[in-house]
């Protein structure tokens, strides 16, 4: 992933300035204080080793005053495989630009994921699955993540597997409803389910 040259980076937000000045040193501090990430450089600095995966690229039509124009749409997931994940979408006239935009948005959408050992069939107490049954929805797609015992793996479609793997979830059962062939909605439904592990009120 990107390496930020601190001497060249000029933060545009208060959070960015605190990160550059060393007042915020971890991504955990960002979420503990409810800061909103508006600069991808913040993620590059605070989450070293962030990985990315291209989930889908297709052509979409955009209506302009001159008629329809074709654009490439990219869907990308990023994560550190240890409790943080993001999903982004980018549109551009060139594939590379669309991917770059999607990566940038995915970083801005980074969220913490609460992991655990929520299956009654397992008592290892390690953060290999989700801590409880959780749901996420996007468009017509609804995804339910169900805690699974260690060794089960990711029982899910390829798109869901990619997002879950980047989040650091290793064992989970999934149940899906809706048109999962729509990569964007499928990825966002999984992302929203993972988001709910952190923001769910017990």
Curated annotation (Swiss-Prot):
What NCBIfam families does the database record attribute to this sequence? Answer: PRK04044.1, uS5_euk_arch
Q: Which UniProt keywords apply?
A: Ribonucleoprotein, Ribosomal protein, RNA-binding, rRNA-binding
**How does the annotation summarize its subunit structure?**
Part of the 30S ribosomal subunit. Contacts protein S4.
Family matches, as InterPro entries: Ribosomal_Su5_D2-typ_SF, Ribosomal_uS5, Ribosomal_uS5_arc, Ribosomal_uS5_C, Ribosomal_uS5_euk/arc, Ribosomal_uS5_N, Ribosomal_uS5_N_CS, Ribsml_uS5_D2-typ_fold_subgr
**Could you tell me which residue ranges the S5 DRBM domain spans?**
50-113
Task: Please describe what this protein does.
Answer: With S4 and S12 plays an important role in translational accuracy.
Give the protein family: Belongs to the universal ribosomal protein uS5 family.
Gene Ontology terms describing biological process: translation
Query: Which parts form a coiled-coil structure per UniProt?
Result: none
Q: Which organism is it from?
A: Pyrobaculum arsenaticum (strain DSM 13514 / JCM 11321 / PZ6)
Q: What is known of its domains?
A: The N-terminal domain interacts with the head of the 30S subunit; the C-terminal domain interacts with the body and contacts protein S4. The interaction surface between S4 and S5 is involved in control of translational fidelity.
Its name, as the record gives it, is: Small ribosomal subunit protein uS5
Q: Name one GO cellular component term.
A: cytosolic small ribosomal subunit
User: Is Ribosomal protein found in the keyword set?
Assistant: yes
Question: Recorded GO terms, molecular function?
Answer: rRNA binding; structural constituent of ribosome
């Amino acid at each position: 992933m990107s390496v930020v040259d601190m001497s060249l980076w000029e933060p545009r937000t208060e959070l960015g300035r605190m990160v550059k000045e060393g007042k915020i040193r971890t991504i955990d501090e960002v979420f503990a204080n409810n800061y909103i990430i508006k600069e991808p450089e913040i993620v590059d600095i605070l989450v070293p080793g962030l990985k990315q995966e291209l989930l889908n690229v297709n052509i979409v039509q955009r209506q302009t005053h001159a008629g329809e124009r074709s654009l490439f749409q990219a869907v990308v997931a990023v994560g550190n495989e240890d409790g943080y994940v993001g999903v982004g979408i980018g549109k551009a006239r060139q594939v590379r630009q669309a991917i770059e935009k999607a990566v940038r948005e995915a970083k801005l959408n980074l969220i913490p994921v609460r992991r655990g050992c929520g299956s009654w069939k397992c008592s290892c107490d390690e953060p290999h699955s989700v801590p409880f049954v959780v749901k996420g929805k996007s468009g017509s797609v609804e995804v339910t993540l169900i805690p699974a015992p260690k060794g089960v793996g990711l029982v899910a479609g390829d798109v869901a597997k990619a997002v879950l793997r980047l989040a650091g979830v290793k064992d989970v059962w999934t149940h899906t409803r809706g048109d999962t062939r729509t990569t964007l909605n499928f990825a966002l439904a999984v992302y929203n389910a993972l988001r709910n592990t952190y923001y769910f009120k017990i």
